[in-house]
């Protein structure tokens, strides 16, 4: 947000994270100062290294700077990039914004490593000063090299080593990120380096605003709020996420095999209460979706009942693990609670969960359940844990439920719930699933008022659609079929239905 204010978009903040307003993330179409799309963590060093290589190959001269948070450093992609950058020797500046937070509190061994680095600024200042002194005298560079070898041995025993130095980076810092003069000085020093350099900046999330300092997790990606109270404007207190978390706690209280896994999103996925009630069965792996999926597979193989809660947009990162570690074996009963499925609104294009139907449908043996309301979410979670032998994905949206609150999951012999048409023959059939059933029913009412005979088909289980619909719909299809869904066209339910009905010569 500070970057956007400094680059001419201050006046646009009245429409932050709104339709036709400015994005909460980097967006090149907004400004030439946004170098790339940004929304998912851990990728900045990779993109920056690519830009640095392009600069060198094309013979240009400019600095490339990647900014990455300590939370994003819990993602494996960041280490792939750091490893490659350090080995390449390509001049590149990486600014590590270390505020000990991602969205929730940071976790993992790296977080502890950074904590050690934070407490040794005296060593870093002394090291920098010694290089400046010896570098200014004749033969000083040889002295520095000699001292460095001794220094490394002493440091390895007495002081925490810097992982970044071991990976080939010049390590500068830590420096107080709220001291503008100190930050400017260390960045000028970094610009003089001719090799990969990491600047370690210590900041406090929400610095200078009491409410944000006291509750940093609540001020991640904020929309409008009252600055005098720190409270956001009204939102539904009961959401699919909260119902999921509540239901999982109830089930876990009765079954010690149930575990919860999340990738740095315990509060966002509704698992905060689970983490406090069942701390030994709660696993926050950091921003590491691939690891979360594969670890869940391992848990399931050894008799546990893992429920891995991940946003739809972030589960894309674990696609290979869903296939290789979960689905191929066929009998791994791991449950994936896919939050923020469909259009997410304020979070923008990078966070829309519109690809999950396409990529999940392509995985053999994976059951995909789509609750339309809270009651169905509860029923489907129970079914996934106790009535399925393989992997199950439960897909649900951001926010609360709509007007349709009936639990249509009582008869699992069929994945279809069909409304009774108001007329003997329906000329139009609307097919939908999940939260979009509310829009389908509204459309049916509007069309019926116009004298158009409509029936609505609600799909509870996407993975079984081909088997059930291809038979039933042949006998009761209207002349026109609409499929209403919030997903990309390629690989969507509508494409599946059109293909299956065409194969059966129904259309």
Where are these regions (language model features)?
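Cofactor-binding active-site loop characterized by glycine-rich and histidine/acidic residues
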Residues: 1-88, 258, 262-263, 271-272
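Non-catalytic terminal/interface segments that mediate subunit docking, oligomerization
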Residues: 6, 203-316, 324-330, 411-412, ...
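A glycine-rich helix N-cap at a beta->alpha junction
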Residues: 12-22, 86-104, 122-125, 283, ...
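Active-site nucleophile and cofactor-binding loops and adjacent substrate-binding regions
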Residues: 17, 26-45, 68-72, 175-177, ...
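A short, small-residue-rich loop immediately preceding and capping a beta-strand
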Residues: 36-37, 60-75, 92-95, 258-261, ...
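Long, well-ordered, tryptophan-enriched scaffold segments
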Residues: 99-244
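Glycine-/acidic-rich phosphate or pyrophosphate-binding loops and their flanking alpha/beta elements
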Residues: 185-188, 220-221, 239-254, 270-276, ...
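Peripheral docking tails and interdomain loops at the edges
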Residues: 225-236, 345-347, 366-367, 488, ...
């Amino acid at each position: 947000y500070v970057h956007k204010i400094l680059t001419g978009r201050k006046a646009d903040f009245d429409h932050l994270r709104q339709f036709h307003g400015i994005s909460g993330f980097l967006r090149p179409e907004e400004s030439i100062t946004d170098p790339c799309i940004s929304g998912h963590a851990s990728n900045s060093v990779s993109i920056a290294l690519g830009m640095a290589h392009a600069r060198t190959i094309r013979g240009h001269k400019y600095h490339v700077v990647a900014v990455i948070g300590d939370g994003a450093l819990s993602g494996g992609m960041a280490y792939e990039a750091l490893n490659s950058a350090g080995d390449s020797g390509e001049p590149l500046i990486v600014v590590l914004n270390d505020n000990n937070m991602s969205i929730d509190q940071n976790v993992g061994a790296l977080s502890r490593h950074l904590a050690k680095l934070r407490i040794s600024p005296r060593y870093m200042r002394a090291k920098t000063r010694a290089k400046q002194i010896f570098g200014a005298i004749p033969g000083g560079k040889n002295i520095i090299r000699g001292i460095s070898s001794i220094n490394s041995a002493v440091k390895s025993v007495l002081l925490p080593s810097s992982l970044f130095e071991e990976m080939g980076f010049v390590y500068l810092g830590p420096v107080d990120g709220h001291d503008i003069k100190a930050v400017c000085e260390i960045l000028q020093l970094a610009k003089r380096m001719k090799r990969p350099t990491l600047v370690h900046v210590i900041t406090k999330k929400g610095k200078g605003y009491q409410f944000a300092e006291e509750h940093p997790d609540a001020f991640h990606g904020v929309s409008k709020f009252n600055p005098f109270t720190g409270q956001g404007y009204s939102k539904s207190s009961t959401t699919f996420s909260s119902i999921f978390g509540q239901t999982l706690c109830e089930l876990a209280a009765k079954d010690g095999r149930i575990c919860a896994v999340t990738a740095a999103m315990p509060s966002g996925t509704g698992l905060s209460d689970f983490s406090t009630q069942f701390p030994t069965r709660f696993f926050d792996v950091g921003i590491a979706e691939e690891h979360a999926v594969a670890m869940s597979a391992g848990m399931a193989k050894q008799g546990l009942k893992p429920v891995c809660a991940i946003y739809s947009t972030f589960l894309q990162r674990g696609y290979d693990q869903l296939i290789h570690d979960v689905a191929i074996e066929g009998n791994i009963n791991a449950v994936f609670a896919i939050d923020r499925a469909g259009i997410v609104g304020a979070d923008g294009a990078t966070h829309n969960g519109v690809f999950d139907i396409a990529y999940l449908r392509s995985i053999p043996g994976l059951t995909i359940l789509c609750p339309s309301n809270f009651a169905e979410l509860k029923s489907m979670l129970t079914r996934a844990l106790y009535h399925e032998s393989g992997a199950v994905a439960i897909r649900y949206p951001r926010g609360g439920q709509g007007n349709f609150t009936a639990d249509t999951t009582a008869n699992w012999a069929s994945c279809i719930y069909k409304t009774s048409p108001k007329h003997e023959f329906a000329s139009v059939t609307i097919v939908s699933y999940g939260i979009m059933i509310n829009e389908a029913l509204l459309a049916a009412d509007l069309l019926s008022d116009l004298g158009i005979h409509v029936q609505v088909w609600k799909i509870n289980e996407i993975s079984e659609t081909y088997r059930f619909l291809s038979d039933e719909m042949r006998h009761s299809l209207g002349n026109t079929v609409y499929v209403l869904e919030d997903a990309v066209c390629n690989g969507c339910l509508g494409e599946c239905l059109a293909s299956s009905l065409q194969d059966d010569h129904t259309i």
